């Protein structure tokens, strides 16, 4: 009986998960690497009149590794039928380097506007990270 208690005790102690969640120094920095940045820190998107929408890729760096779910939104939306549509896809996932990408698209009605893009996520330690950037929609043609 004593031997059985020792074996059960060792089994329970040996199978206990004593790992602690490592709270890395996660960050969130979003950018628009394909766009020119103005002197006031805003990005400039030149609208292409040959397309229904003009697209660009936005980037997010978290330094938190793979599989962080990021949520995106903008302060402007576009009405399609009866649905309001954001100018950015609502979600993306980070890769092994902690980097995520998402598409941003503007319609012609946004020429002259400055759109604020928001991105956020909550890391494994429960810390919420939020960042934003501004994109000016211009038509220089």
Regions found by a protein language model. Give the residues of each.
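Sec-dependent N-terminal signal peptides
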Residues: 4-13
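Bacterial Sec-dependent N-terminal signal peptides
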Residues: 12-41
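Short glycine/proline/serine/threonine-rich loop/turn segments at secondary-structure transition edges
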Residues: 108-116
């Amino acid at each position: 009986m004593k031997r059985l208690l020792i074996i059960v005790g060792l089994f329970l102690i040996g199978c206990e998960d004593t790992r602690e969640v490592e709270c890395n120094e996660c960050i969130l920095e979003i950018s628009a690497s394909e766009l020119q940045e103005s002197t006031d820190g805003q990005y400039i998107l030149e609208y292409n009149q040959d397309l229904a929408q003009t697209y660009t890729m936005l980037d997010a760096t978290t330094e938190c590794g793979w599989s962080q779910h990021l949520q995106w939104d903008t302060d402007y939306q576009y009405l399609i039928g009866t649905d309001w549509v954001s100018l950015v896809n609502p979600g993306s996932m980070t890769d092994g380097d902690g980097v995520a990408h998402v598409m941003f698209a503007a319609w012609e009605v946004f020429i002259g506007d400055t759109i604020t893009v928001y991105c956020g996520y909550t890391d494994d330690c429960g810390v919420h990270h939020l960042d934003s950037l501004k994109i000016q929609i211009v038509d220089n043609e």
